[in-house]
Amino acid sequence: MNKLGIYVHIPFCRKKCNYCDFISFPCKEHLIDNYFSALEKEIDSFNIENKEIFTIYIGGGTPSFCDSKYIVRLMSLLKYKFSIKEDAEITIEVNPGTVSEEKLLDYKKAGINRLSIGLQSTNNRLLKLIGRIHTYEAFLETFEYAKKVGFENINVDLMLALPTQTKEELIESLNNVINLKPNHISLYSLILEENTELEKQVKNRNTRTSKWRLRKKNVPFI
């Protein structure tokens, strides 16, 4: 039986981050119900035979911005329609400030076994600069909730080369997250995408870019 992975895009969020160029619609709660109804119809239209699902990734946007009932419904349909491996990795992206202990518990009961938490930095000044809705302290609360409800597989996203970010601030963020001992850390370099709020700010010289750049090889300060 051939293996297959599934990605489900949930294009809603509370606020679009300044660097984001993904398809996302901030504060459009009135569209969520119709979107999930259309999504469920599309999933139901697929007829996939002799394929075993080994991974499911629910991304966005901010999937955790939506009421957990939609994610529970989605997971129920995926299980009904497809042959999902017993040990399949099933991930949902969550952002601090959009989840509660109850919502995370709903995810776990629905069969989600991995969280990808968008942190980006442990420096509150930088978080505000790039338009994140949360603080480092809110992330710590979310991380604690995740552990409390029993999530054992947690990824934490961090970003480097943020505007005005220093090497020392990056190292501090890395050390802070490493000390929490998540299963995985994803470290992404900022890309100034065209027509994003951050790209406009830099172009208009309202925001300074980092004074440092990573080399392709031998990054001595990490």
Model feature map: region roles:
Residues 24-222:
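Conserved non-cysteine loop/helix-boundary elements of the Radical SAM core domain that shape
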